[in-house]
Design a protein with these regions (language model features):
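C-terminal segment of classical bacterial N-terminal signal peptides
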Residues: 18-28
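N-terminal small/polar-rich segments of proteins
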Residues: 28-116, 121-170
Length: 170
């Protein structure tokens, strides 16, 4: 009888070990965990664009009262901007240091997307001039009004200018 219980005990231990090996690993397995640090970095993003092609401002009439040429005006260009930066401004500049004729630019009908338009800017040199201030974390737009002015003393001629718009600190 002693041998019978010994075999039962041995068989029971073997059966338990087999069951643990076969099924117990799933029931008693340890979970594995891995961690990762993810850095999110958003860089300052500025975009500026123009809707409208090249312009030709033609002065071709005289003001009868002042005996001076009437200015040529065009407001068909739209300026669009987006910036996620703080305290930005939009500056405008020309590539001509000493222009012969006067060109003025005014930002009109500014959208609610941020920015305050400065008064009309005269491009009398090639330095940048503030056009819109207070652009901050926004997308906005405005119409650009160009005014070309000539004096009779300046005579006739053509002058082509490359106008540059820049979002910058300010």
């Amino acid at each position: 009888m002693k041998r019978y219980f010994t075999n039962i005990t041995s068989n029971l231990l073997l059966a338990t070990a087999f069951a643990w090996i076969a099924f117990g690993q799933h029931a008693y397995s340890q979970q594995a965990t891995a961690t990762q640090v993810v850095m999110l970095r958003v860089m300052e993003l500025n975009k500026i664009d123009l809707v409208g092609g090249p312009l030709t401002l033609q002065i071709n009439s005289i003001n009868d009262n002042a005996a001076q040429p009437n200015p040529a005006i065009d407001a068909s260009t739209k300026l669009l901007w987006t910036s996620n930066g703080d305290a930005r401004k939009i500056a405008v500049g020309s590539d001509i240091a000493s222009p012969r004729f006067i060109l003025k630019i005014e930002a009109e009908k500014s959208s609610s997307g941020g920015g305050i338009a400065e008064p009309e800017v005269t491009l009398s040199d090639n330095a940048p001039h503030d056009l819109i201030l207070g652009v901050q974390r926004s997308a906005g737009s405005c119409q650009l009004k160009f005014t070309a002015i000539a004096d009779v003393k300046q005579g006739t001629g053509e002058e082509s200018r490359l106008i540059t718009y820049t979002i910058t600190g300010g």
